[in-house]
Amino acid sequence: MAQVSYEEVNLMLRLYDMRREPRLRQARAWFVENFHPTSVEDMMEKYPQGSEENTYIRMVISYWDMVASIVNRGLINDELFFESNGEIWVVWDRMRTIVPIWRGAFKNPRLFANIEETYKRLEAWREKHAPGSSAAMRNMMAQIISKPKGA
C-alpha cells in the first residue's frame, strides 16, 4: 500500500464533504436510480433543459468531472481514491454511450475525458484487485435497470 500524505487525505475528506451537500446528495441518488439514457434524444425528451432532472444530471457530471480532474493530476493517490469512490465508475458507465455525440455536437473531443480516464484507471485497478468485478457490476446494474419499478 502506497504512503499517502496528510494533504491527500485532507483533500479526499473535503471531496467527501462536498458529496454530502443535501442537493448534490439528492442529485446523486436520482442519477444512480433513474439516469439510463438510450440516446441524447431520449435524454433530452425525458430531462429537458430547465427541468430538475436536467439540473441533477449536470450537478452529478460536473462534480465527478471536477474530481476526476484532481485525480488525473495525481493530487490524490489512486489507491486511496479508488478504494472508496466507485460511484464515478457508475456515472461514466451511465453516460458513456452518449458522450461521443456530445463531443461531436460541441466539437470538443476532450469533453468529459477526465471522467473517462479515471473510469479506465479505476476499472484496471479494480480488475487487478478483484478480477471480474466490473463485469459483475455491469450485469447487476443491467438487471436492476430491466426490472420494472416496484417489482
Regions found by a protein language model. Give the residues of each.
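Acidic, Ser/Pro/Thr-rich low-complexity regulatory regions
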Residues: 1-151
